[in-house]
């Protein structure tokens, strides 16, 4: 069981307590810090839509520290990011693997970043099937179609050729923040030492 911290704010109307994620949301920050499944994707998607309705002109910040997850769940978040009017700024801290790497790349151009020790990993979609041979064949075709879709999305956001992406994602393809910048997954590696600037 995870512990979710609460913060207390003083306002002119008294004291108010928020769980930390709700408090971040007030500042237009969405923290994606778990494996991506349908339930979690629904929460992230709802937060994106809420922030768009609240102010369609202000950027939304999506902080990522995730091992990835289900392709369909990740694509629901990705499509919402592309659909809403505000730019979505993405920031990787820790790791952005699998579908989380795709979400990192899917941020607004020029507004995708990572902290210096972040790790990014791309790979092809995985799947498994049991049952009759025809069922396994159907599932294999679906995984290959998803692979084409993911490669096309990476091509759109990185500028790499589909052939290069396909070659690189045949196995787990790990990158440092600087390597991810060179690859086109992100635009900036954040190097600011706040302690020295204060």
Swiss-Prot record:
Gene3D superfamilies, from UniProt?
Answer: 2-enoyl-CoA Hydratase, Chain A, domain 1 (3.90.226.10)
The question of whether Hydrolase is a record keyword is answered with: yes
Q: What is its EC number?
A: 3.4.21.92
Q: Tell me yes or no: is Protease among this UniProt entry's keywords.
A: yes
How would you classify this enzyme at the top EC level? Answer: hydrolase
Q: Which GO terms describe its biological process?
A: protein quality control for misfolded or incompletely synthesized proteins
Q: Which GO terms describe its molecular function?
A: ATP-dependent peptidase activity; ATPase binding; serine-type endopeptidase activity
A single cellular component GO annotation: cytoplasm
Q: Which SUPFAM superfamilies match?
A: ClpP/crotonase
User: What is annotated about its quaternary structure and interactions?
Assistant: Fourteen ClpP subunits assemble into 2 heptameric rings which stack back to back to give a disk-like structure with a central cavity, resembling the structure of eukaryotic proteasomes.
Relate the protein's function as given in its record.
Cleaves peptides in various proteins in a process that requires ATP hydrolysis. Has a chymotrypsin-like activity. Plays a major role in the degradation of misfolded proteins.
Could you say which protein family the record assigns here?
Belongs to the peptidase S14 family.
Spell out the protein name for this chain.
ATP-dependent Clp protease proteolytic subunit
Source organism per entry reads Leptospira interrogans serogroup Icterohaemorrhagiae serovar Lai (strain 56601)
């Amino acid at each position: 069981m995870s512990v979710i911290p609460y913060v207390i704010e003083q306002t002119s109307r008294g004291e108010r307590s928020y769980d930390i994620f709700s408090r971040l949301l007030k500042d237009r920050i969405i923290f994606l810090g778990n494996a991506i499944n349908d339930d979690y994707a629904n929460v992230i998607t709802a937060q994106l839509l809420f922030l768009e309705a609240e102010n369609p002109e202000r950027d939304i910040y999506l902080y990522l520290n995730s091992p990835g997850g289900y392709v369909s769940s990740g694509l629901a978040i990705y499509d919402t990011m592309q659909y809403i009017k505000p730019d979505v700024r993405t920031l990787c801290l820790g790791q952005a693997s699998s579908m989380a790497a795709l979400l990192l790349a899917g941020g607004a151009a020029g507004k995708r970043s990572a902290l210096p020790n972040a790790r990014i990993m791309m790979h092809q979609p995985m799947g498994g099937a049991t049952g009759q041979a025809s069922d396994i064949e159907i599932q294999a075709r679906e995984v290959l179609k998803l692979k084409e879709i993911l490669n096309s999305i990476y091509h759109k956001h990185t500028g790499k050729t589909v052939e290069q992406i396909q070659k690189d994602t045949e196995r787990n393809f790990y990158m440092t923040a600087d390597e991810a910048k060179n690859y086109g997954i992100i635009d900036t590696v954040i190097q600011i030492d706040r302690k020295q600037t204060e």
